[in-house]
Amino acid sequence: MPSHKSFMIKKKLGKKMRQNRPIPNWIRLRTDNKIRYNAKRRHWRRTKLGF
């Protein structure tokens, strides 16, 4: 990836970076909670973003 990114690409990368984190622990502690982990985690080497 070039070091000079367009602003739109940079914005998309930032969004994907924020999405790619584990769920907070307090969400796991809520009543009737069925979410155990973030099912949409993405590993930088296994799955590419495609842009």
Curated annotation (Swiss-Prot):
Keywords: Ribonucleoprotein, Ribosomal protein. The keyword Ribonucleoprotein applies. Residues 7-19 have a biased composition (Basic residues). This is Large ribosomal subunit protein eL39y. Residues 1-21 are annotated as: Disordered. InterPro entries: Ribosomal_eL39, Ribosomal_eL39_CS, Ribosomal_eL39_dom_sf. One of its GO terms (cellular component) is cytosolic large ribosomal subunit. One of its GO terms (molecular function) is structural constituent of ribosome. The gene is RPL39B. The keyword Ribosomal protein applies. Belongs to the eukaryotic ribosomal protein eL39 family.
